Amino acid sequence: MINVNEFKPGITFEDEGNIYVVLTAQHSKQGRGQANVKAKVKNLRTGSTTLKSYTGGDKVQKAHIEKKPMDYLYNDGSNIILMDQESFEQIEIDVKKVEWELNFLTEGMKILVRQYQNEILDIEIPINIELKVINAPDAVKGNTTTNPQKKVIVETGYELEVPMFIKEGETIIVSSETGKYGGKSSK
């Protein structure tokens, strides 16, 4: 059992028959009242994100999740195809479970598959991902307000805002947690 006061990002638990991973946890105490914990959690079975509230001191069942290293091969439209790095066995995961992660997956990427009692839940990808910019408009002269940004499209089709100096063909670092620009790659 896990005390909800110990919630922090990455903790997996079972609640009402579902498996969740904590994305963010906010602890608050009201005057003489009891402490509350609000946690933004992801349901690992459905892929949906929700906000759960608990009273301080509540306990939930810990979910022991196995993480298996795999390679991302391709997306066939309804499933992503992954290959086990040891047995070369291929598995499929419904794209609905990994909608956010699809924005960052590139062929051959090393990822972790989360399993609970032999049930494949979803995937875990690196936090910082290097992606090539395939479409970037030129910087417009005179467009220099504080911290000017422009929208670019990376090789996976994901669109994000980056500083004006980023050019087409450059490799940038993107955070898979926030989807935001994290810096220029050294590649």
Curated annotation (Swiss-Prot):
GO terms for biological process: peptide biosynthetic process. One of its GO terms (molecular function) is translation elongation factor activity. The keyword Protein biosynthesis applies. SMART domains: EFP, Elong-fact-P_C. One of its GO terms (cellular component) is cytoplasm. It is found in: Cytoplasm. Pathway: Protein biosynthesis; polypeptide chain elongation. Involved in peptide bond synthesis. Stimulates efficient translation and peptide-bond synthesis on native or reconstituted 70S ribosomes in vitro. Probably functions indirectly by altering the affinity of the ribosome for aminoacyl-tRNA, thus increasing their reactivity as acceptors for peptidyl transferase. NCBIfam families: efp, PRK00529.1. Belongs to the elongation factor P family. This is Elongation factor P. It comes from Mycoplasmopsis pulmonis (strain UAB CTIP) (Mycoplasma pulmonis).
